[in-house]
Amino acid sequence: MLEEDIYKTIEEQGEAIYTEKRSKFLAFAIPVTTLDEVKEWIEVYQKKYYDARHVCYAYRLGERGDQERSNDNGEPSGTAGKPILGQIHSKELTNVLVIVVRYFGGVKLGTSGLIVAYRAAAAEALEAVPHIEKTINGEIVLRFSYPLLNEVLRIVKEEEPRMVEQVFDNDCMVRLSMRLSRLPRLIERYEKLVISSRNDLKIEKI
């Protein structure tokens, strides 16, 4: 079980070929982060394998995997897209699209046979690439006058958030990103600085 502020995904494309009773299943695991990317990749594979009987798929998006969909593309309901999505879930992955292309071999596989074949093809494609862990991060924006710069940067150095954006002038601004589980401590330290600076520091939570 993953920690609440960690998710697993892939960064490379994986491929696999699964054969069952002369039907060939070509499976592709693709890293994606947006619905537009998903649509583009589906279109690419539909055009590339225009002569295939079925181009089925499933995807899961978002750091918490809260956006997902599966498609049977003409196969009996629940025999293709759902087993593919099930493999994405079983490996606790998100931000991934799996496409399985089927070339019919002349022998019907039946409902259970299709489920097994699509599940196996998807699993092999997902297992063909490394699974990596990423953290779910939160951001804060700090606004302050220049005399506070050293104090602000000292906390940055000690807590090690990632500095996303910075402006150092008479009026300064920094935008910091940090793993969610560590963000409260960072905010707490800056809230103490708000008090000691007599409200010269403003904190905006994003």
Task: Outline where the language-model segments fall.
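C-terminal regulatory domains involved in ligand/effector binding and gene-expression control
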Residues: 1-78, 201-206
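Conserved mixed alpha/beta catalytic, RNA-binding, or beta-rich assembly cores of soluble enzyme
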Residues: 77-90, 101, 114-118
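Glycine- and acidic-rich phosphate- and metal-coordinating loops
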Residues: 94-104
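Short glycine-/aliphatic-rich beta-strand segments at the starts of folded cytosolic domains
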Residues: 130-146, 174-176
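Short amphipathic alpha-helix segments
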Residues: 143-161
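Short amphipathic alpha-helices in soluble, non-transmembrane regions
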Residues: 152-158, 184-194
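Conserved short beta-strand edge segments in small beta-sheet-based binding/regulatory domains
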Residues: 163-168, 192-206
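Terminal, non-globular segments
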Residues: 176-185
